Amino acid sequence: RDVERSRGLGDVYKRQLTETLKQAGGVAIYISEFLSQFYVVFWTGPIISALLLTLVALLSSLILKKINSRNDLPLIFLLPWLSLLIISLDYDYYEQGTIAYLFLLLFLWLYTNIKTRIKFIYGICIIPILYGIAGPIVHLFAISALFFEFLTNGKKKYISIIYLLIAALSAIAGTYLGYSRNLTLAFLPEAYCNPLQTVSGIYYAWYALPMTMLLVAYLKRYKEPVSLKG
């Protein structure tokens, strides 16, 4: 009986895993659900959240330093982390969103370190993969990769506009095939929030990365810290 019960539980687990991974962002959902089981242990939840946000701060700083290598801008480099920290305090925000953000930063960091010859191919291929792994955060990847090319005067900067099209096609195809319930959840960050509540702050977390990229690129013209005295 115990063996049959174990097999039954294993079958249920496999079905749940399959159903989860069939969703757009299924990997991020699965990881967040896996981590949630440890939240019953005292102080474990805050520690896990802190570790995730620390990784966000590290990866975003590494990406931004590719645009501006100045060492006197640590607070500016932390703006994406700060925006995500604030939204993480909202109970209607799912930790799935932070994990998806981490996947975005990881793939974007890899993108910034790839040689020009294959970077464009990597960008095209990784977009549908990121959509499947992490969901609509793929659009932020496409925008950020495009910004990076223009801000670093990349050789493929104009053709990189196609990233936006591929991200949109991935979302539309995913909705048509049933991986996303509707186009809103395929394109917008509402996919990472309680659908019954409005969490407007999630948009600030998405705006923060490309806006910070623009800011550090602007500050690149100054070799020394900008004087408040002019």
Give the positions of each predicted feature.
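Short aromatic-rich membrane-water interface segments that cap or initiate transmembrane helices
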Residues: 15, 19, 34-41, 192-203
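Transmembrane-helix motifs of polytopic, lipid-linked glycan transferases
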Residues: 50-68, 106, 110
